[in-house]
């Protein structure tokens, strides 16, 4: 992966004079895989061990890729789902909405007396949450909650969570109280996952909301989180 990124950087920086173009017969073809949506939804709803029955859940889909998926998942899990920013038009993705503008969801949750809210970014690989009072639950707190739960249930491999240098010291103090070990990487979910693979860890993430569960995915997945 690093080698590929270096080559791309050289193309961008102009260090390589000629960029090779694929021949017409080698380009390939486009395939309709619309069934993938239902497969993905089916996979997500197969994972939780607890129901959202009668929970009032707010979703901010950031006018992005979660717009066609998230509500179906929470509906299937029994939630009473309320959604904002789920009408992408090709230009409004992440515009004053989603996990980068959490204040929109905070107001929505409080105004509608919801139990919890989840905000995604445009490509839905990040998730931030909001409690019933509109308080932000960032990636650090999500990792703490998930790490504690997984440790208590014997699912936190090596009793370790992989974080980045951006995580708050409060997270590490909380981990210490729970007997959870931690490792720090450079900023970037790719570095988090690299550490997880090398050391066999099952949970890692960033304060920004990228959270990786290595048993289920190789990248952050906001809806899965």
Where do the protein language model's features map onto the residues?
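Gly/Ser/Thr-enriched, mixed-charge loops and adjacent short helices
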Residues: 1-110
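Buried hydrophobic positions in well-ordered alpha/beta secondary-structure cores of metabolic enzymes
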Residues: 44, 60, 102-106, 118, ...
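Gly/Ser/Thr-rich loops at beta-strand to alpha-helix junctions
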Residues: 62-68, 124-125, 167-169
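Proline/glycine-rich low-complexity loops and linkers
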Residues: 2-41, 46, 133-207, 211-213
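Short, glycine/acidic-enriched loop or turn micro-motifs at the edges of active sites
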Residues: 63, 122-126, 134, 209
């Amino acid at each position: 992966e690093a080698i590929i990124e270096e080559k791309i950087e050289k193309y961008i920086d102009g260090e390589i004079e000629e960029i090779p173009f694929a021949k017409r017969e080698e380009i390939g073809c486009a395939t309709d895989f619309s069934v993938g949506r239902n497969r993905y939804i089916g996979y997500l709803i197969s994972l939780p061990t607890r129901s959202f029955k009668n929970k009032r859940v707010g979703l901010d889909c950031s006018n992005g890729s979660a717009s066609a998926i998230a509500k179906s998942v929470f509906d299937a899990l029994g939630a009473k789902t309320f959604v904002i920013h789920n009408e992408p038009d090709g230009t409004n993705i992440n515009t004053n909405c989603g996990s980068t503008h959490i204040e929109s969801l905070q107001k929505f949750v409080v105004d509608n007396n919801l139990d919890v809210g989840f905000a995604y970014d445009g490509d839905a690989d990040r998730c931030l949450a909001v409690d019933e009072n509109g308080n932000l639950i960032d990636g650090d707190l999500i990792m703490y909650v998930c790490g504690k739960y997984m440790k208590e249930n014997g699912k936190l491999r090596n009793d370790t969570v992989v974080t980045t240098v951006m995580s708050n010291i409060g997270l590490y103090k909380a981990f210490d109280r729970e007997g959870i070990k931690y490792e720090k990487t450079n900023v970037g979910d790719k570095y988090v996952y690299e550490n997880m693979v090398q050391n066999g860890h099952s949970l890692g993430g960033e304060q920004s909301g990228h959270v990786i569960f290595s048993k289920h995915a190789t990248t952050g997945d906001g809806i899965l989180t």
